[in-house]
């Protein structure tokens, strides 16, 4: 069992070396977005994370670009947005979530300018933005360079953590308390192999899919 785990860790480290430069480039892009704090960019990233629930990230980003380029992301009606989300699961619900998120944007922008604690920002997002859970909030913060060492726990990551023995089983659902518990375990593992937890989810995703995205 130990030799198997050692082999898997070796594969993780090898994959990390392969894509480390790409990951660091991504994080520089994320940090640039966060440092600009451009309201339009921030809203685009927030809406992207709303769309990613049970949907392919690449498809979601294409939809965001379409909505953004046509001005519908900020001003489109429910019908206009929904019609352009047909390639995304639960497109009607998510169209409504985008419209609802508009009313919280000014408060969010103020929070991002005033608050340095990423965990507090994540907590606010989960509480105040419909369609945003712990995973989506962490994803959003990562994409604007504010995630620190928080972990995006999607099904790919959870499968990998289970395979490594970091969690005994894959939970059917993740309450905020359970999310933080698993996140801490992942952070501890990441520290033990000298890979930032925020980089590790990229590595796990790459191992599962062969891709690096957002």
Residue positions per predicted region:
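Hydrophobic (often cysteine-bearing) scaffold residues that line and stabilize catalytic clefts
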Residues: 39, 43, 56, 94, ...
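Short, hydrophobic/amphipathic alpha-helical patches that form generic packing surfaces
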Residues: 45-54, 100, 142, 201-209
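Alpha-helical ds-nucleic-acid-binding substructure associated with the helix-hairpin-helix region
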Residues: 64-130
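Active-site catalytic microenvironments for nucleophilic, acid-base chemistry
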Residues: 53, 66, 104, 143, ...
């Amino acid at each position: 069992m130990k030799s198997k785990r050692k082999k898997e860790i070796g594969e993780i480290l090898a994959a990390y070396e392969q894509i480390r430069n790409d990951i660091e480039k991504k994080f520089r892009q994320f940090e640039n977005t966060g440092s600009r704090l451009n309201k339009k960019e921030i809203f685009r990233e927030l809406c992207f994370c709303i769309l990613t629930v049970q949907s392919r990230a690449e498809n979601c980003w294409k939809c965001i670009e379409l909505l953004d380029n046509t001005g519908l992301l900020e001003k489109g009606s429910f019908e206009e947005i929904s019609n352009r989300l047909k390639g995304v699961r639960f497109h009607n619900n998510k169209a409504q979530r985008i419209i609802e998120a508009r009313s919280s944007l000014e408060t969010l922008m103020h929070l991002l300018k005033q608050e340095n604690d990423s965990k507090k920002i994540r907590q606010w997002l989960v509480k105040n933005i419909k369609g945003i859970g712990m995973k989506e909030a962490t994803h959003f913060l990562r994409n604007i360079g504010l995630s620190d060492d928080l972990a995006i726990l999607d099904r790919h990551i959870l499968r990998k953590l289970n395979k490594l023995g970091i969690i005994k089983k894959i939970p059917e659902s993740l309450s905020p308390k359970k999310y933080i518990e698993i996140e801490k375990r992942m952070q501890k593992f990441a520290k033990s192999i000298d890979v930032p937890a925020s980089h590790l989810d990229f590595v796990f995703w790459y191992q599962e899919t062969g891709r690096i995205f957002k």
